[in-house]
Amino acid sequence: VAAGRPRF
């Protein structure tokens, strides 16, 4: 998952 992003 991208750092600092929600896990959608």
Curated annotation (Swiss-Prot):
Compartment(s) of residence: Secreted
GO biological process: neuropeptide signaling pathway
GO cellular component labels: extracellular region
Lineage: superkingdom: Eukaryota
Keyword DNA-binding among UniProt keywords: no
Residues bearing the modification Phenylalanine amide: 8
Signal sequence, start to end: none
Keyword field contains Transmembrane: no
Keywords: Amidation, Neuropeptide, Secreted
Main location: secreted
Regions that span the bilayer: none
Functional description taken from the UniProt entry: Neuropeptide.
Protein name: Long neuropeptide F
